[in-house]
Amino acid sequence: MTSPAPTLPVHPRRIGLLDRVGFSVTLLATGCFALILGGAIVYPGFLTPAYILQQLQIASFLGVIATGAMLVILLGEIDLSVPWTVTGTAIVVTNIAGSHNPMLASLAIPLGLATGATIGLVNGLGVAVFRVPAMVWTLAVNAMLLGAAVFYTGGFKPQGAVPWLATYAALGHTLGAPNAFMLWLIIGAITLWLLRRTIYGRYLYAMGNSQRALFLAGARVRTITVCTFVLAGILSSLGAILLTGYTNQAYQGMGDAYLMPVIAAVVIGGTSIQGGSGTYLGTFVGAVFITLLSSILAVMQMPDAARQIIFGAIILAMLLAYRWPATRVAGTNQ
């Protein structure tokens, strides 16, 4: 008679992570359906396919930017330079596209992405090399970008043109689906591959859990940090380019409205604000949820101050809700 093969114990932290991620995605998906059904009471058009596709299109702008923010938060850091990375990129792109040099104008989008990469590089070096806390460094960079933009434009609306490719990406459709949403799906697939299938993804999660342990294991933690901030800067710039195409302009404070929603989308999606845990699926659904909520608040003519209060309250409520499965799992393992 043979004895049964022993089963390997599952680490309680792993159970808690899977439970929390599944709980967050389920809760957010339920919330999305509830918002659509509740919004239909106020505005019947909420249930139409055209409205849902429009919301997915708008969610794409937030989702692309939130992708970069999630990577930084997985490190256990936070990027507060998002608002003026977005605005600065929009100003650069429209000014270059509106130049009278056709060759230079054709480089508007690549140079816009390079702007985001440069800002991300500055942020990464400040955090990884100079050891300044990310919250302080990126906030200072954001203030410098604001000052540079106001100095360059004189405080007036930036002049220039919008690249046709930005307009096509933001407003065009392919097989009935918004191009912006299709682009977001592609970026999401690449992000999932990076997080699940590459050594970079494993290092990213490990750094969020214990940067010192990863350093002692021989990993190049400074390089990982810098690369992550560069990716976040590029994605913020890509979001800015899409926004420029959608609004057909660049304007002062273009990215100001995105800082809180970006953080909210990542956090309510189940990514730990302390780093080391979270999935992109949660961030994806979180961006859709925030977009639907913003749409309903706009229909209700809610003032911007009230929207910010609601965003903050939702973040706190979701964080408290996520403690329930983690506490329950911890209790069963005692």
Where are these regions (language model features)?
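Cytosolic-side transmembrane-helix boundaries in multi-pass membrane proteins
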Residues: 1-37, 189, 209, 216, ...
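Hydrophobic alpha-helical transmembrane segments
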Residues: 25-30, 55, 63, 84-88, ...
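Structural signal for alpha-helical transmembrane segments and their membrane-water exit/capping regions
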Residues: 31-47, 75, 149-157, 192-199, ...
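Single transmembrane alpha-helix segments in multi-pass membrane proteins
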Residues: 34-101, 125-132, 266-280, 313
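Alpha-helical transmembrane segments within multi-pass membrane transporters and channels
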Residues: 101-142, 285-289
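Helix-loop-helix "hairpin" substructures at the membrane interface of multi-pass membrane proteins
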Residues: 104-112, 118-123, 173-250
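Transmembrane helix-bundle core of multi-pass membrane transporters
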Residues: 130, 134-197, 224-227, 246-255, ...
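Transmembrane alpha-helical segments in multi-pass inner-membrane proteins
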Residues: 236, 246-312
